[in-house]
Amino acid sequence: MPIAIIGAMEEEVNLLRNELSERKDTVIANYHFYEGLLNSVPVVILKSGIGKVNAAIGTTLLLDHFKPSSVINTGSAGGFRAGLKVGDVVVSTEVRHHDVDVTAFGYEYGQVPGMPAAYTADPKLIATAEAVIERMDAIRVVHGLIVTGDSFIHDTERSNLIKTNFPDVAAVEMEAAPIAQVCHQFDVPFVVTRSISDSADEEASLSFDEFLEIASINSAKMVMEVVRTLADSE
């Protein structure tokens, strides 16, 4: 079974896609999938599009059609943890929705009814990422909580609200939680690796445009090393 790699934007999948050998392109319901060998390892790459619904639909099609052994979600994110800089990579320990509120009925903030409050990344995939970290001196990598919502966070008020609800948050983005939720439903292990493109503040949009390429390159490098290490361990 292939390893699945999901990125929302062209910039987030382009480097990985260009590294594929024996490439085969498939379009299902306007979602683009790219099969091939990445460093001799079978993979399938999905360009999901931006946002939670796009990510959920694309991931469902991916898992149902291609039957991957595991899922790696890559791309960019806004940095929340103190000390995080543009280009640093956050590896998920768990993923949550930051824009779901059904607390009136006894659920945790961010919890979708009938679903877990948090989606825990696969221990083997986290351990693999840790092994990769030791070999990547040029890229700073940290672990932590990644939260997801259907908004690009670019103001202090919303940043502070997220920090209030999730004090341990490391990064914020727009696709990881639905990807993790679909993986949970299909019982497929996942991990999220996101490179910091901005600080989720008033300068976020300018920073994102300027540093998206750096963030995408660093996240892609991390994914390629994780894929190689997973293959070597089997």
Swiss-Prot record:
SUPFAM superfamilies: Purine and uridine phosphorylases (SSF53167)
GO CC terms, sorted: cytosol
Recorded catalytic activity of this chain's protein: S-adenosyl-L-homocysteine + H2O = S-(5-deoxy-D-ribos-5-yl)-L-homocysteine + adenine; S-methyl-5'-thioadenosine + H2O = 5-(methylsulfanyl)-D-ribose + adenine; 5'-deoxyadenosine + H2O = 5-deoxy-D-ribose + adenine
E.C. number(s) listed in UniProt: 3.2.2.9
Protein residues bound to substrate: G78, I153, M174, E175
Keyword GTP-binding among record annotations: no
GO molecular function terms attached to this record: adenosylhomocysteine nucleosidase activity; methylthioadenosine nucleosidase activity
Active site as annotated: E12, D198
BP GO terms, sorted: L-methionine salvage from methylthioadenosine; L-methionine salvage from S-adenosylmethionine; nucleoside catabolic process
InterPro entries found in the cross-reference section: MTA_SAH_Nsdase, Nucleoside_phosphorylase_d, Nucleoside_phosphorylase_sf
Highest taxon, organism lineage: Bacteria
Pfam families tied to this protein: PNP_UDP_1
Hydrolase as UniProt keyword: yes
Pathway: Amino-acid biosynthesis; L-methionine biosynthesis via salvage pathway; S-methyl-5-thio-alpha-D-ribose 1-phosphate from S-methyl-5'-thioadenosine (hydrolase route): step 1/2
Annotated keywords: Amino-acid biosynthesis, Hydrolase, Methionine biosynthesis
PANTHER family: 5'-METHYLTHIOADENOSINE/S-ADENOSYLHOMOCYSTEINE NUCLEOSIDASE, 5'-METHYLTHIOADENOSINE_S-ADENOSYLHOMOCYSTEINE NUCLEOSIDASE
Its biological purpose: Catalyzes the irreversible cleavage of the glycosidic bond in both 5'-methylthioadenosine (MTA) and S-adenosylhomocysteine (SAH/AdoHcy) to adenine and the corresponding thioribose, 5'-methylthioribose and S-ribosylhomocysteine, respectively. Also cleaves 5'-deoxyadenosine, a toxic by-product of radical S-adenosylmethionine (SAM) enzymes, into 5-deoxyribose and adenine.
Family in the record: Belongs to the PNP/UDP phosphorylase family. MtnN subfamily.
Protein name: 5'-methylthioadenosine/S-adenosylhomocysteine nucleosidase
Origin organism lineage: Bacteria, Bacillati, Bacillota, Bacilli, Bacillales
